[in-house]
């Protein structure tokens, strides 16, 4: 097959390209130029879109002896990822920009251009397994990236290859070193590539502006003021601006954010727990399960947040979501209701809920949706009139009182 290897400049995409070549495919390397201001993109080895990354990708392509190109998707990236990121926070949602980039850039813009140019597939370094249209978790549980691929359609997956998904990361680094790739020991990227200094709150503030509001406790008492709800995330403990210690001595966390009124609510850790999720913007879920319950596991964060659940698909014919967003053409006309069999903490509106079926050969990804509401423990799963929450953090971050999104 003729394939396009998406080369980020990291070790995973380098080995993916090498494996595609070794498998006998005709391979070209493509690096995506995503920033309209290259000098504003993170410099150094921890970014994923820097000029150094482009140079690293080119050196790997030269080592492999394959053609190398840089394709400029900066306009698409700004409109579909950066602007979406800002707009989502402005309406009280918490988007995952890496997931959005996969959906709109790597497996829409890149894939569409590749197919138009006569290529058969796109090769990436994602840690996921794909065989005969079945998408599974990667073998390396610590590096599994199937979650951020949950938004892909069956049609897109038919033109995807994930060559490193059956290997653990240390072996990938060894393989890269044996091949003489200079990126063999390059650190993984973790931060948001379009926020070079990692100051998400300042970035959002520069785009959204001051929107003062109140911080209230669960009893409705005003305990502080703030400059904008985008400075908070559900589960956040530090930096709340609370002027005094709580009477009971227990720490307080952000439990809810209402972007419409500008109100941030704080409460105890117990107040973070949810027992149900409602999701829309559904992808890949089998129409045959419509109207009946099925057991699954649901993951709500890229790393962690996996619990067993009982799910069902119900009709949701409205063309507009509760947040006012018009549904896209490839979204299924239903909503997903999930009864969590174990509670989750810090679940956010706007995050992805990715559904799996456990399997000994690697959990099978069934589909995904975007969280639009949650229900409290013991409450029925139904549309909630109260506004949704913003932000989501890993359990470890809650325990340490750190904000995992900032």
Swiss-Prot record:
Q: Name one GO biological process term.
A: tRNA wobble position uridine thiolation
Region Disordered: list its residue ranges.
Answer: 378-406
Positions of the record's site feature: Interaction with tRNA: 126, 351
Q: What is its EC number?
A: 2.8.1.13
Name the segments for region: Interaction with tRNA.
143-145
Segments of skewed composition (Acidic residues)? 396-406
Briefly state the protein's biological role. Catalyzes the 2-thiolation of uridine at the wobble position (U34) of tRNA, leading to the formation of s(2)U34.
**Family membership noted in the UniProt record:** Belongs to the MnmA/TRMU family.
Q: What is this protein called?
A: tRNA-specific 2-thiouridylase MnmA
Q: Which organism is it from?
A: Corynebacterium urealyticum (strain ATCC 43042 / DSM 7109)
Species lineage: Bacteria, Bacillati, Actinomycetota, Actinomycetes, Mycobacteriales
